[in-house]
Amino acid sequence: NTTGAYLPQKPYKLKLSKKADLIGFDADFKSKDWALLSICTGNQVMKNQECNLLTLGGFTVCRALGFPWTPRTEFVNVVLNGQYRGLYYLAETVEQAEKRIDVGADGFLIENDAYWWKEGEQYFKTEHLPYMMGYTFKYPDPDVLTEDTKNAIHEYMNSVESAIFSHSGANRYIDYESFAKWLLAHDILGSDDVAGSNMFLYKESLGN
């Protein structure tokens, strides 16, 4: 993440040439996309700046609350170009996959993204979204995203916002239990990044 880039221990995003199960579950968990999350943290909630217990605690809290999916992790020692870089969390990343976030062929996965403005990024904005934020597409893949599907997702999110801000019929669009669990997890953890970037929303079928 961007904050982590300024810390002594850098996080890394891994993009493999072919799918692999790096954590060692089974073939169903194979993926090209993985993350190496740093142990150190700049989060002021944590008293010990040497140990990022917030990340590990977050995964534990989400599993305890019964989230449909929480990234699987494993501690790993990282050596890069012959140099030892320290202890990391090897973690699954957020993506459409049967063993991650499975929205099916007709669903979508988007991110409330502070870096929507990056060159080549496909994005859209809604009326009530803060000016510094934009929604970017994670699934369908932006490279194959049709204009019709893009417009349908945009229209759907406008309807979601309208229902929320008019206090009428929001339950037709959002899963209250899922939203409540998400808020509770951030309250328990004292997260200072709630509703910032790295917030993902998904729908399993755009037609329903």
Cite the ranges covered by each PLM segment.
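Conserved NTP-binding catalytic cores of kinases and kinase-like/nucleotidyltransferase enzymes
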Residues: N1-L53, G57
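Short acidic, glycine-rich loop/turn motifs
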Residues: L16-K18, L80-G82, E204-S205
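Residue-level detector of short, conserved catalytic/binding motifs and their immediate flanks
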Residues: K10-Y12, W34, V76, L87-Y89, ...
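Solvent-exposed aromatic/hydrophobic patches embedded in short alpha-helical segments
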Residues: L53, G57, F179-I188, F200
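Internal "kinase-insert"/substrate-recognition segments embedded within catalytic cores
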Residues: K18-D21, F29-N43, F67-P71, Q83-L184, ...
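A conserved helix-loop-beta module that forms one wall/lid of the active-site cleft
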Residues: N48-N81
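Catalytic activation segment of kinase domains across protein kinase-like and atypical kinase folds
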Residues: V194-N208
